[in-house]
Amino acid sequence: MLLGQPAQKSEVDIVLVALATPVLVGVYQDGKRIETIESHKKTSDILPSIFQSLMKQYEIKSVYFARGPGSFMSIKLVYIFLKTLQIAKGITLFGCDGFEFTDNQPIKAHGSHYFVKENDTISTKKLEGDGAVTFRLPDSIDEIRCSQENIAPLYVLPAVKV
């Protein structure tokens, strides 16, 4: 390193799960998680500051993100935010369905309705009990199935009874 030149930033991948509270962000180097960020703030409030901080510290190569199902507004916000980063910074995006981060457990939809995944089909079902699911970040990026081709939001809207 020459005097007066900034130190080279480490290249990392990011995993983002913002389908519910808390928002989870994992920083991965060589495929292994080296840092975890968890926030109970609104996605719209915390996402820009998290990524601003990460971009100061690291060179982000790619972002793996839960594209749904879950909070409709959060899904939309995350997609627009990450798509902007992809265009502006050349960051590669990988979309994952949210069940990759719940060990295929139901994801809260609304009231007593939950998103469930059976035979690769996502639907809504009414379930008894609190059904609180805990999202988790994998220790290794190799543990999740994501696609670079399928990054569009995964909106699964429950049927509304009239």
Predicted regions and their residues:
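Histidine- and/or cysteine-centered catalytic micro-motif in compact active-site loops
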Residues: 66-68, 98-99
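Oxyanion-binding and handling regions
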Residues: 1-46, 56-57, 88-162
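Short glycine-rich anion-binding loops that position phosphate/pyrophosphate groups of nucleotides
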Residues: 21, 68-69
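DPxDG-like acidic metal-binding loop motif
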Residues: 62-67, 73-93
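Short, well-ordered alpha-helical segments
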Residues: 41-48, 79, 83
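Phosphate/pyrophosphate-binding loops at sites that engage ATP/ADP/AMP, CoA/4′-phosphopantetheine
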Residues: 49-62
